[in-house]
């Protein structure tokens, strides 16, 4: 079992800059004492997300389920089927009732809106721990 590195990379995708800022602020620079310091990668389009994930090095991807024109849940499902080393994927959902859609997307975890800092940091920290301790992420 390996420990989380001192520096981790978290991608946040939303077409809305304010949503990306809310996520970054809620999760913070280090979501828990035992996780690495986050290097944030922001993406405003699905093409940017695809390019970043193809490049590799992303530990956790946070995808806005309400993003336009391509929502994060569809992207999550696509990545789970297409990427051999898919990072942990967290989907941001606007309604708790959309939890079934997040399950369909094969997301590893969800963050509900309104974005709550303690919950958001805990979700990201757990995914970072899982990523670096060999616990497999959900696969399609």
Model-derived features: positions:
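Conserved phosphotransfer microenvironments
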Residues: 59-80
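Short hydrophobic/Thr-rich beta-strand motif most characteristic of the beta2 strand and flanking loop
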Residues: 35-44
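His-Asp phosphorelay/catalytic-motif detector in bacterial-type signaling
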Residues: 83-88
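Acidic, metal-coordinating helix/loop segments flanking the phosphotransfer/catalytic sites
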Residues: 43-60
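Conserved acidic segment of CheY-like receiver
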Residues: 7-28, 61
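CheY-like receiver
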Residues: 132-140
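Alpha4 helix (beta4-alpha4-beta5 surface) of REC/receiver domains from two-component response regulators
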Residues: 94-110
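C-terminal output helix
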Residues: 115-124
């Amino acid at each position: 079992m390996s420990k989380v590195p001192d520096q981790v990379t978290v991608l946040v995708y939303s077409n809305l800059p304010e949503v990306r800022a809310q996520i970054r602020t809620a999760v913070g620079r280090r979501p828990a004492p035992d996780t690495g310091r986050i290097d944030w990668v922001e993406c405003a389009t699905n093409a940017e997300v695809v390019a970043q994930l193809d490049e590799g090095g992303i530990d956790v991807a946070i995808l806005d389920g309400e993003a336009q024109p391509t929502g994060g849940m569809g992207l999550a499902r696509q990545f789970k089927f297409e990427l051999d080393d898919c990072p942990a994927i967290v989907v941001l959902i606007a309604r708790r009732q959309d939890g079934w859609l997040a399950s369909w997307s094969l997301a590893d975890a969800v963050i509900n809106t309104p974005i709550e800092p303690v919950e958001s940091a805990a979700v990201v920290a757990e995914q970072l721990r899982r990523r670096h301790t060999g616990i497999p992420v959900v696969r399609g």
